[in-house]
């Protein structure tokens, strides 16, 4: 529901714009600024926003066919922990959905769909939360250019 169900790769490119400031851009040109500093979401907050946004889209697309919400908020929370080896990660991730619809037949129909849609998003459709819950390897490669001489980093 939240994404087209084709198996095509997804990608974004990150560019540094200043110390601690970055822009992520997708192939279509959409972009978001983030980093460390006033007015910027941190990478951890972007992860929380991605989880909330993925499920929000699933719920919004379906309920909006019946009725336009008068309120639609999703709060994503998590506890950042420091493991014994010094590594950081989040645990206890949680989404809280706050929706309201008009008090008419269409609004009541949309309101009645929300719990089922949230469950379906969590269990089946939200690629972001399902990836986090199931875990996946994050690989990397490095290419460094020093004084104009390109080469692979050791």
Give the residues covered by each predicted segment.
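Extended beta-strand/beta-hairpin segments
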Residues: 1-49, 59-154
């Amino acid at each position: 529901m939240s994404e087209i169900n084709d198996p095509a790769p997804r990608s974004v490119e990150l560019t540094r714009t200043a110390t601690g400031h970055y822009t992520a851009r997708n192939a279509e040109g959409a972009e978001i600024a983030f980093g460390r500093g006033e007015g910027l979401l941190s990478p951890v907050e972007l992860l929380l926003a991605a989880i909330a946004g993925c499920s929000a889209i699933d719920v919004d697309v379906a309920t909006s066919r019946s009725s336009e919400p008068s309120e639609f908020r999703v709060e994503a929370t998590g506890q950042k922990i420091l493991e014994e080896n010094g590594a950081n990660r989040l645990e206890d991730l949680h989404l809280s959905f706050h929706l309201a619809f008009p008090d008419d037949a269409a609004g009541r129909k949309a309101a009645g769909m929300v719990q089922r849609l949230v469950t379906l998003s969590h269990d089946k459709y939200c690629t972001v939360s399902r990836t986090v819950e199931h875990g996946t390897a994050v690989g990397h490669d490095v290419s460094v250019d020093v004084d104009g001489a390109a080469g692979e980093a050791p």
